[in-house]
């Protein structure tokens, strides 16, 4: 069976870019995260981390951030480990771990309590390293740090709910699913890390057009390792008469509207040249230049997600480049083809669909 995938970013203005320090950052971050992986997973479980796909995503997403790119890789590796680990624990344990991580980041300068969970220790270490990315003379570092921790808490709380839903076999409506996945995908954290070197004031981050662009980005980041949290599964569950191809066609139509909305908001973004005050001053360019870099980072992040899905073997095996070029996805049959089998095969081969 063949499915034609929608070319969601056909008119996207941002081309593929890879951080030139990718190889070194990947090696450094892999060595950094390995002790945690070894503590949490057995030999079989550790195989999921051998290829370090997350460092490629970080290097595609933060292609312009040349300063210590390994810290971006660290973030993605840490939360990938967290996500994989909470997939196999109870909702109660997931909730407890979320509290441990947030507390570790809020109190990163304090000694860890005796018997601290290794995820808490690693979160504390990550946060100490990540904050070195903030400009030494920045005026908005506290705003940036507070925003990142709040987004971390939002993400971890959502992952806890996801664990509960998985435990109870819950399948959401499309609207509920999109709202949930904007949090569980960690999209806000990805964007918050773009801000770290830009020293953007609160007035910019709370501007309605900037927030609209951030919201649109989060709609493109829909991925999961569980069939109940796959958008195509949700669409077909809500529309029992819809074929698999019809579900992808629905996705293509929805995504086209999202892309157009992003482009419209970029065109309507006002100038920040006249904004003044201590919080707007920086040694790294005018406020308008820094805002432009941030918006470019949003666009690049969307492109990175799409490129990454096809360039790793995680979703399409060795067929990624061919699938990207032809847009044809082959769903391999099982002995007895059922709707459930098709969705499970689809989840393995195309779990990086765009919402």
From Swiss-Prot:
Pfam families: Terpene_syn_C_2 (PF19086)
Originating gene: Agr11
Protein family: Belongs to the terpene synthase family.
Cited SUPFAM superfamilies: Terpenoid synthases
Identification of the protein by name: Sesquiterpene synthase-like protein Agr11
Listed GO MF terms: metal ion binding
InterPro entries: Isoprenoid_synthase_dom_sf
Record keywords, A-Z: Magnesium, Metal-binding
């Amino acid at each position: 069976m063949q499915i034609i995938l929608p070319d969601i970013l056909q008119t996207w203005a941002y081309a593929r870019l890879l951080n030139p320090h990718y190889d070194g950052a990947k090696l450094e971050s892999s060595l950094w995260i390995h002790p945690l992986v070894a503590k949490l997973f057995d030999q079989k479980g550790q195989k999921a981390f051998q290829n370090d796909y997350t460092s490629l995503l970080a290097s595609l997403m933060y292609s312009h951030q040349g300063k210590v790119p390994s810290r971006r890789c660290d973030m993605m590796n840490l939360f990938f480990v967290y996500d994989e680990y909470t997939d196999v624990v109870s909702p109660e344990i997931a909730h407890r771990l979320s509290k441990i991580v947030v507390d570790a980041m809020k109190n990163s300068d304090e000694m860890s309590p005796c018997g601290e969970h290794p995820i808490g220790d690693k979160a504390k270490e990550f946060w100490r390293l990540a904050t070195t990315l903030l400009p030494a003379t920045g005026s908005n570092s506290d705003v940036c740090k507070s925003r990142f921790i709040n987004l971390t808490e939002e993400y971890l709380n959502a992952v806890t709910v996801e664990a509960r839903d998985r435990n109870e076999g819950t399948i959401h409506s499309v609207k509920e699913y999109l709202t949930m996945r904007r949090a569980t995908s960690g999209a806000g954290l990805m964007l918050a890390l773009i801000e770290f070197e830009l020293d953007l004031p609160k007035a910019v981050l709370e501007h309605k057009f900037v927030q609209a662009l951030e919201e649109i980005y989060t709609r493109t980041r829909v991925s999961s390792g569980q069939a109940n949290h796959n958008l195509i599964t949700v669409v077909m569950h809500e529309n029992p008469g819809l074929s698999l191809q019809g579900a992808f066609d629905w996705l293509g139509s929805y995504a086209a509207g999202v892309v157009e909305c992003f482009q419209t908001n970029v065109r309507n973004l006002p100038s920040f040249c006249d904004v003044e005050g201590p919080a707007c001053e920086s040694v790294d360019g005018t406020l308008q230049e820094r805002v432009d870099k941030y918006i470019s980072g949003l666009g690049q992040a969307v492109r990175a997600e799409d490129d990454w899905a096809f360039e790793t073997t995680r979703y399409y095996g060795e067929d990624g480049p061919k699938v990207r070029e032809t847009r044809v996805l082959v769903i391999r049959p099982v002995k007895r083809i059922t709707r459930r089998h098709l969705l499970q095969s689809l989840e393995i081969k195309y779990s990086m669909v765009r919402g």
